[in-house]
């Protein structure tokens, strides 16, 4: 079964800064550029944008995600285009459901936002094959992302298809639509030098640009991470954690930051990466300081300001919203003004923008362990380490990247509340029918060699059976040895499961050694190879094999002598019987057993089914799959994705400290701000409300591949549990329990000075009864509240003028 198109929502919305026009409206819009900005209808503008990948959420979620993005100060939404989702089989297209790309762009337009169409069609995106269809490999002479007719023909056909769909729907700016930029290829410059064919790579990237421009879309084309050999008819852009020191390859084009990574992707064996709101704001403020801000920057990736469920991730969302607001307030001077840099000391710089009689200033402290005082026009400003202050009038600090005023929200998982429903789920079960695969008969075809899995299965299933037989005289014991390029392998001898193994930590070449008893006569060996997604990045990634390609496969006796089966007659069959029967759709004709309430546990290749009532309310619904091992989950026939809660995240030093100061990095030494070490890599899976039926049973089906215990599975809701905020005397504190009419139920802490612990478990310092009274009166029973911090609410004898408040929702 394939899970690459699983509908579990992953919203990647975050910060992005660009120079554009006002909200997209009726009538054609011209989009050009110069060395300072994009120019829309002759006017320079700054626009804030972010990324939402339409296949990673449901169409019903799109309006709310886009609305929250806009409320966070964004003016544009960008997305990749997912080729293998739209064309899973050659010339068989999919533009429905969460692949209805035109509907997605219309939702953006309806919200009054701009859009950026990143066709690629190679996208990376932590997506199978980087979005390229596996069937491309079946075409003779095919070489991915090099100058060759087979690849370029297919790429042009798909690119033209997408462009024409957008033209037919009047989605480009010149047609009155929201799309103001389009992208061709993606991060090709990162791998060009590793392809061992510089001429072909150069010819290919120039062909891409020429092909794109022939589409006549009426908006500029961009290329990400193309720092050398840049075609003259595209704008090259920057991706990364920091882009303030990056510049385009030539004059006359604007400096564009297409991906500002707000975190990092999650792997099965890795903890969660968190990039602090302070560091993201620091990077963006430096980017504006360096060249004035008429540019595009896209925040992309995980730990984003909207989480995978579409909830606000605070304080990141609020802190960046505050930054967006300040940048907008000095928009005109940034895009038209002249600027001067002044170095005050090592790693401390002041940049002053001037336009007519107005000015705006940035003060930058790049020291990662030292606060500094900077005197500007007679006023001294304290600047924390690793921060930027923005002074819209060069006098008053309106924003400092290290000082967060936005609230922190702690989301909690709550047991679902459904009246009259038993607490535990009642499961029935069915064993996967392995019998047809336990002999080497009835395969799709035979070969006297061990084939590569992706080519053989065309990526239509995670599973491929390799089956052979051997005639043996008498009984004997052997060790079955299999060398495989993974990602996972199960071995059966004469119908009995004798061993299982998977690749450790992404090192896909591994061995399986299992005891094997042969009887007199014909013996059958069945090997089930499983993939867990396909490589999406790097040079020639399509040539990375999967499965038992080449082997060897041997039977080794007690004396070390081997019988090499690698060139035996192997029968091949992709998929499992349950896939062909579509058990996950719960069709009539499937016989489920409840065994009088006793459910088998820790049995590999078992299907489980239960029903549940949708949790009341509108909060996010998740299913907790703790207790299971490895498999796939569906709700009402909708794929939630692969699960593997038995795979725990490694212990890493970064799990034990988090300091926003200093360079953030996701790879190599120096990782920090990690959580979840030693815990399941993922145990909670989003169940979009649109998947659920209210007032009637909902069906969940699990395919447990490795053997687990479903008795611990439960459905829960996710909502704000605690909210916290800090502010100095003279400022205000705003608290909110978020959406769905959640109200503030208690004020837990009102403390001046440093509160100990973390939000949700703060221990107060110097408690203020006056502050407690003020927040109780203003906030209890309210969805949100704002309180001015005055001297009247300071605690008696409290030395600090910073108040920390914690409330329960």
Curated annotation (Swiss-Prot):
Subcellular location as annotated: Secreted, Extracellular space, Apoplast
Reaction(s) catalysed (UniProt annotation): Hydrolysis of terminal non-reducing beta-D-galactose residues in beta-D-galactosides
Protein name (record): Putative beta-galactosidase 10
Glycosylation sites (chain numbering): 198, 249, 260, 343, 373, 483, 567, 596, 748
InterPro entries named in the record: BetaGal_gal-bd, Galactose-bd-like_sf, GHD, Gly_Hdrlase_35_cat, Glyco_hydro_35_CS, Glycoside_Hdrlase_35, Glycoside_hydrolase_SF, Lectin_gal-bd_dom
GO cellular component: apoplast; plant-type cell wall; vacuole
UniProt lineage: Eukaryota, Viridiplantae, Streptophyta, Embryophyta, Tracheophyta
Residue positions of the active site: 187, 259
Family membership noted in the UniProt record: Belongs to the glycosyl hydrolase 35 family.
SUEL-type lectin domain sequence ranges: 727-809
Pfam families according to UniProt: BetaGal_gal-bd, GHD, Glyco_hydro_35, SUEL_Lectin
EC number: 3.2.1.23
Record organism: Oryza sativa subsp. japonica
Annotated GO biological process: galactose catabolic process; plant-type cell wall modification
